[in-house]
Amino acid sequence: MKSLKELSLRIKNIKSVQKITKIMQMVSAAKLLQSQKKLSNSKLHISKLHSIISSLALSADQELLARILNINNEDSFLVFIIASDRGLCGSFNSSVVKFSQEHINKLIANDKKVDIVFFGKKAFETGKNRFNSKNILKVENSKGITLKRVEALVSDIDLSKYNKVKVFYSKFYNTFMQKPILETIKPWSKDSLLIDNSVVSPLTDYSYEYEPQNIEFILKSLTQDYVTASLYSALLESAASENSARMVAMESANRNTKEMLNKLALLYNRSRQAAITTDLIEVIGGAESL
């Protein structure tokens, strides 16, 4: 049995850990609310943009549309793997990387050119041994994501070199459910998990005048904007999932520390009682010998 001093020190250490996990849980909850608000605004924007492109695509010549979207060429891929810079969020980082590995390895096995961009240092640390280093193009910090930063990144990479752009990220469903998914953001598709269908409304009942009067130019511009907006929205989805996963992980840690403290308190009291009983027996035995 451990000594009273050892038990007391262990209880003190666990209480210190409990304070930290409680604070982290509260911070994650606050960040989750902020992430959800940003995500809601982003979904509204990308859903409206998606609706406009859908309407233009209906009125465009199919051969022209195929040329704009590069539908017939799938040789060059750019893949974004979005996770976190930090841990303490359960299997959040590893699940996204593991999910992406299977899909990426299939592309590489079929002799496709694949470049990978990691968002999050933990994602890179988890994935660097799973992929060939020659396929890793960049590693980006997942903190402080803004639309301007995403626009600069997209411009720096030059997405025109790639026929397909895919994003692996953790989709936020609710506080207790986040799921790794794959989203193709180039070429544009009428089906997307990033949009909110409740705010998408068809625009085909209206008559529009385009300026400039060149539907090819307009569609190219809008689909490029859509790629940037989609990547930004996926990053916000991932941030919400990360904060939710960390909040749940810290809540679980708090429960575990409470259980440990209860067990240690019981053990401490029993040890203390045993020590007092032993002292009393020794005192009584000494008195009787006198």
Curated annotation (Swiss-Prot):
An example molecular function term from Gene Ontology annotations: proton-transporting ATP synthase activity, rotational mechanism
Keyword Lipid metabolism recorded: no
Stored SUPFAM superfamilies: ATP synthase (F1-ATPase), gamma subunit
Subcellular location: Cell membrane
GO cellular component: plasma membrane; proton-transporting ATP synthase complex
Mode of membrane association: Peripheral membrane protein
Swiss-Prot/TrEMBL keywords: ATP synthesis, Cell membrane, CF(1), Hydrogen ion transport, Ion transport, Membrane, Transport
Gene Ontology biological-process annotations: proton motive force-driven plasma membrane ATP synthesis
Predominant subcellular localization, coarse grouping: membrane
Alphabetized InterPro entries for the sequence: ATP_synth_F1_ATPase_gsu, ATP_synth_F1_gsu
Keyword Transport: yes
Subunit structure: F-type ATPases have 2 components, CF(1) - the catalytic core - and CF(0) - the membrane proton channel. CF(1) has five subunits: alpha(3), beta(3), gamma(1), delta(1), epsilon(1). CF(0) has three main subunits: a, b and c.
Family of the protein in this entry: Belongs to the ATPase gamma chain family.
Its biological purpose: Produces ATP from ADP in the presence of a proton gradient across the membrane. The gamma chain is believed to be important in regulating ATPase activity and the flow of protons through the CF(0) complex.
PANTHER family found in the cross-reference section: ATP SYNTHASE GAMMA CHAIN, ATP SYNTHASE SUBUNIT GAMMA, MITOCHONDRIAL
Protein's name according to its UniProt entry: ATP synthase gamma chain
